[in-house]
C-alpha cells in the first residue's frame, strides 16, 4: 500500500516540512506492474503475499478490479501488508518501503504456484520486493519451465551471477544501471549502448535502460534501439517505471516485437505521470490509443 504526500521540496536531514494532498492508494511494484500488464490487455496472474489486514484487502480489490487474477496470493497473520512511503515534489519522488508480507513469501510457495499455472512461452515478470532467495529461485524455476523471464532489479539489488543466465530481459533505470554495472546513464547513449552490448556477452539476452524523460534504449545481441520519451504534463512519476515494465511484459506476452513494445511502454509510462497516485494513474490500452492517436495530446 502507498502512503503518498506532496511537499514543495524535499526536506533536509533533520528538517520537518509541511505536506499536503495525502493519498492512500494500492501500490507495490509487483502489483503495479501486474495492473499495467492487465490494463494493456495481457492475461495476468500475480503470485504474492499480503497481510491479513485492511490494506491487504484493499490491494486485492484493486487488483481484481483491474482484471488481475489473484488465486495465488496468500494472506498471512505473520506480517503486515507491504507499505511504501512516497514523498512527491513537482513531478519527482522519493520512496521508502517496508516489505512486510512480501519478505516472508517462501520459495516453495512460488515454485508450486508456477507449476500450477505457467505454460511454456508464458512471460514471467519479477522484481526484488520479495526476499532474494525466493526471487532468485523463482527466476531459475521459471526459466526451467520454458517461460520468458523479465527481471526489474528494483529495489536496487545485486543479482547473483548464476541467476543472470536465466534472465531473458533485464529492465532497469539509471540508478539501477549505476549500482549494478557502474554505468552512468547521463553519459551519451552511444557510450551506454556499447557498454550494455558488452554486458550481453555474459548477462541477460536483452537489456532495456530507461532514463526518465530522456527516453529508453533497448539493447539486444546485434542491435539497439533508442526510444524517445513522450512529452506530457507531468504531475506524479510514482508509477511511471512500473507502468513501463508491466506494459513491456504485456506486449511481449501478446507477441509484439521489442521495438513495438518499447514504443507502447513509453506511451503508457508517460500517460501514468498525468495523475497522482500509483495504480489509479496506470492507463488502459484504449486510453493510450485515444490520447496519442486521436489528438488528445498535451502538446
State what each model feature region is.
Residues 157-162, 189-299:
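Conserved phosphate-binding/catalytic region of the ribokinase-like
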Residues 34-43, 88, 250-255:
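Alpha-helix C-terminal capping segments
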Residues 115-118, 164-165, 201:
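A short, aliphatic-rich alpha-helical micro-motif
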Amino acid at each position: 500500500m502507498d502512503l503518498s504526500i506532496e511537499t514543495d521540496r524535499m526536506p533536509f536531514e533533520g528538517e520537518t516540512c509541511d505536506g499536503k494532498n495525502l493519498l492512500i492508494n494500492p501500490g507495490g511494484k509487483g502489483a503495479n506492474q501486474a495492473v499495467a500488464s492487465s490494463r494493456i490487455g495481457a492475461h495476468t496472474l500475480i503470485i504474492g503475499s499480503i497481510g491479513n489486514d485492511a490494506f491487504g484487502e484493499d490491494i486485492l480489490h484493486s487488483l481484481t478490479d483491474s482484471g488481475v487474477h489473484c488465486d495465488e496470493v496468500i494472506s498471512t497473520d505473520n506480517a503486515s501488508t507491504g507499505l511504501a512511503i512516497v514523498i512527491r515534489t513537482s513531478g519527482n519522488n522519493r520512496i521508502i518501503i517496508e516489505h512486510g508480507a512480501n519478505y516472508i513469501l517462501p520459495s516453495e510457495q512460488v515454485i508450486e504456484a508456477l507449476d500450477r499455472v505457467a505454460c511454456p512461452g508464458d512471460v514471467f515478470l519479477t522484481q526484488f520486493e520479495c526476499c532474494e532467495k525466493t526471487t532468485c529461485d523463482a527466476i531459475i524455476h521459471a526459466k526451467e519451465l520454458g517461460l520468458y523471464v523479465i527481471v526489474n532489479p528494483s529495489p536496487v539489488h545485486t543479482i547473483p551471477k548464476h541467476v543472470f543466465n536465466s534472465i531473458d530481459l533485464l529492465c532497469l533505470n539509471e540508478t539501477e544501471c549505476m549500482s549494478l554495472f557502474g554505468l552512468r546513464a547521463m553519459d551519451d547513449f552511444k557510450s551506454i549502448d556499447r557498454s550494455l552490448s558488452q554486458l550481453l556477452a555474459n548477462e541477460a539476452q536483452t537489456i532495456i535502460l530507461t532514463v526518465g524523460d530522456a527516453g529508453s534504449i533497448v539493447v539486444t545481441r546485434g542491435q539497439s534501439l533508442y526510444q524517445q520519451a513522450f512529452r506530457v504534463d507531468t504531475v506524479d512519476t510514482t508509477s511511471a517505471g512500473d507502468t513501463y515494465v508491466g506494459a513491456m511484459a504485456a506486449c511481449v506476452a501478446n507477441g509484439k516485437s521489442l521495438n513495438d513494445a518499447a514504443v507502447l511502454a513509453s506511451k503508457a509510462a508517460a500517460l501514468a505521470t498525468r495523475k497522482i497516485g500509483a495504480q489509479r494513474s496506470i492507463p488502459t490500452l484504449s486510453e493510450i490509443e485515444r490520447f496519442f492517436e486521436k489528438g488528445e495530446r498535451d502538446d
